[in-house]
A protein has these predicted regions:
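FNR-like FAD-binding dehydrogenase module
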Residues: 1-696
Length: 696
């Protein structure tokens, strides 16, 4: 039963509720529209690398021209979904003899989706972004198929009675709208008469996406094999999609050889705006400092100068930072493949399949590919490792790789839990022997493109429109059964840049070639672009806000707080701004403590920081405990229309905060937990309660 009041608002006040709701929806819709207007169309690959231009936006015609009977579309923000789409297409071709192609949803129109022959299959690999939103490149597709007056070319009844499709989603189970994009697309297509092959796959980023993918595709393939009368091949032989040839007429210093440049403009030294996800801006680092540092932990504050560019941001947006791989990992990758001596050899890549686009620039070098273009530090997949078994340096290694490929638990114990990437896995399983027989094209095809890392912007666009700041925890941790530490690629790259900026002691491990291709970066610029979000302060500055952000989860809230401080300085009235911040100890990792004092001096009692130190005192105290202590004040603020925000660890902290808020509502209102959960759900639906989400 739903309670007859929602936070002090009686059902009899429906007229007022309607007006308030209309205002809320209008405001949030305005932000959504603004974000969409500001947000450039996102391609998963930089424009320069699309060597095979499409003849048009008619994918059915393209399939017919190329003789394809299976197309795998992807909706991807960081390249992960694109990677799974490529793997799916590759397996369909090698294992079942399908004629496959991979396609970006943003590159085609879907008016003729009903023209796909019933003898074909369409597959979707779809990531969910934000609070159930489509990725940038899937927005138009979703908008079209979900339109009330959607009108396909042939006008069948049902509309898509000829369409056979399969769907795998990428999401995070800890979020409310888990895999909403994949579920929604499947629901819409099914409601229009399309036939879903198998179940909708749910990849969980909070669990093991790789194993979720493996579990989903086997029954899907089984059903598809039956429906399309496919024959599974007994022996899977690697069939290269890309040819790699040496080019002895050039060397790494040749002007037309890519040595890390992100597009042709940068290669020729004439890069210019507009800057966006396919043309990142080489932003100068305006300021950088370590907020704290210890033997095993660091935290960086870094500011990027975007003054004079077309890049605009709003408080609450994300900035994408394009990293490079560390020297040690580049060396290890080339060494285990026996390519150290050939690292600077110029090679050209070409596609054997007209539908497959070369994912990296060409011509280039082995060193460049490993350093700038591939995710060589990413966890190796069980499927990819198993594919390499025939190229093992000896029989015992082949047997071990085969076992790792077949035994999920064995793979988890010896590879996944040790956080091994492809080079360390190959070196471990072969006891240090080199794998010189693997075609290099296998790595280009199977390892994702090195993707930008997205960080919450921790500055205010009202206060600093020409500067974007980030607050980054540097990832460095010990791993069981592993001698060396595990290092985050991008965060340690930023740490190296910070040390260089301030003339500090260089980072011993990992080290980076921070000068960039042809010394273009000089250790002082970083490729970046802006991604807009709907994580916003309320448009009414008098509305209270409650923010929960332990650790670097405080990043977007620093932007919110600085925005409100600036509003006060401009003479605007502001509501109570309450921050719950948690860390280990006040002395060790209380970031921005002095800054909060400065804010307090300006905002007075309109600003308050409630701290939770987990390693001070006999008992551990976390932000959810402080929420319970402040239950009465939180209830009062919510009755005044406060917006509630959470950013940080989604798997643990955010879930605990959600439970605490639900309990506060239940106890203070005297309603059941089920009723309190319904109230919290409605708060989320109206964007009164927002969670800052990681981008998959």
């Amino acid at each position: 039963m739903v309670p007859d009041t929602l936070y002090g608002i009686d059902i009899s006040d429906v007229a007022i509720i309607g007006i308030l709701l209309l205002g809320t929806v209008t405001y949030w819709f305005r932000d959504s529209l603004k974000a969409r207007i500001l947000k450039p169309t996102t391609k998963s690959k930089l424009e320069v690398f699309n060597d095979n231009e499409d003849s048009g936006r008619d994918f059915v015609k393209k399939m017919e021209e190329l003789g394809k009977n299976c197309i795998v579309f992807y909706g991807s923000q960081t390249g992960t979904a694109e990677g799974y789409a490529k793997r799916l297409a590759k397996e369909g071709r090698a294992r079942f003899g399908l004629d496959t192609m991979v396609a970006d949803l943003d590159e085609y129109d879907f008016e003729n989706l009903d023209e796909v022959p019933s003898s074909h299959v369409v597959m979707f690999v779809l990531a969910t972004a934000g609070e159930g939103d489509p990725t940038d490149n899937a927005e138009d597709f979703l908008q079209y198929i979900s339109s009330d007056d959607v009108n396909y070319t042939l006008g069948h009844n049902p509309l898509l009675s000829n369409l056979r499709f399969a769907t795998f989603g990428l999401g995070n189970r800890t979020y409310q709208h888990y895999n909403k994009m994949a579920k929604e697309v499947s629901r819409i297509l099914s409601s229009q008469g399309a036939h879903l092959v198998g179940e909708v796959g749910n990849g969980d980023d909070a669990g093991c996406m790789e194993e979720d993918f493996m579990r989903w595709k086997e029954p899907m393939w089984e059903k598809l094999t039956s429906e399309m009368a496919l024959t599974e091949r007994e022996t899977l032989l690697y069939d290269p999609v890309f040819n790699i040839t040496s080019d002895n007429s050039k060397n790494k210093d040749s002007s037309d050889v890519f040595v890390g440049e992100l597009n042709k403009g940068y290669l020729h030294g004439i890069a210019k705006g507009p800057f966006h996800s396919t043309n990142p801006y080489l932003s100068p680092i305006a300021h950088a400092k370590e907020l704290f540092k210890g033997p095993d932990r660091n935290c960086i504050h870094m500011e990027f100068d975007i003054e004079g560019t077309n890049l605009k941001y709003e408080t609450g947006d994300h900035i994408a930072v394009w990293p490079i791989n560390p020297d040690t990992e580049v060396d290890a990758f080339l060494d285990v493949l026996g390519l150290t001596a050939k690292r600077h050899e110029v090679i050209s890549l070409s596609s054997t399949d007209p539908s497959a686009k070369v994912p990296i620039p060409t011509p280039t070098t082995y060193d460049t590919i490993a350093r700038y273009y591939l995710e060589i530090c990413a966890p190796v997949s069980r499927e990819f490792l198993a594919m390499l078994a025939p190229y093992s340096p000896d029989e015992s290694t082949k047997q071990e790789v085969t076992r790792l490929g077949k035994d999920r638990n064995y793979f988890s114990q010896h590879v996944s839990l040790r956080c091994l990437n492809i080079a360390s896995a190959l070196r471990s399983v072969s006891r240090g022997q080199r794998w010189t027989g693997i075609p290099f094209s296998a790595f280009v095809e199977s390892i994702n493109r090195l993707a930008p890392r997205y960080y919450s912007i921790s500055s205010s666009s009202l206060e600093q429109p020409g500067r974007v700041s980030v607050t980054v925890a540097v990832e460095s941790r010990s791993v069981k059964s592993r001698e060396d530490k595990f290092y985050g690629v991008a965060s340690n790259y930023l740490l190296s840049l910070e040390r260089f900026q301030n003339g500090g002691k260089a980072v011993a491990a990992p080290s980076y070639d921070i000068k960039g291709p042809r010394c273009m970066y000089k250790g002082s610029v970083v490729p970046v672009h802006i991604r807009h979000s709907n994580f916003r302060l309320p448009s009414d500055t008098t509305k209270p806000v409650v923010m929960v952000g332990p650790g670097t989860g405080v990043a977007p809230f620093r932007g919110f707080i600085r925005e409100r401080k600036k509003q006060v300085e401009m003479g605007l009235p502001v509501g109570k701004t309450l921050l719950f911040f948690g860390c280990r100890t006040r002395a060790e990792d209380f970031v921005y403590e002095d800054e909060w004092k400065d804010v307090q001096a300006t905002m007075g009692n309109k600003f308050e920081v409630v701290t939770a130190f987990s390693r001070e005192g006999n008992e551990k105290v976390y932000v959810q405990h402080r929420l319970q202590e402040k239950a009465a004040e939180i209830r009062t603020l919510l009755k005044e229309g406060a917006h509630f925000y959470v950013c940080g660890d989604a798997a643990n902290m955010a879930r605990s905060v959600n439970v605490a808020l639900t309990e506060i509502i239940g106890a203070q209102r005297g309603v059941s937990m089920a009723q309190a959960e319904e109230i919290v759900k409605q708060m989320k639906l109206s964007n009164q309660y927002q969670v800052c989400l990681s981008i998959i």
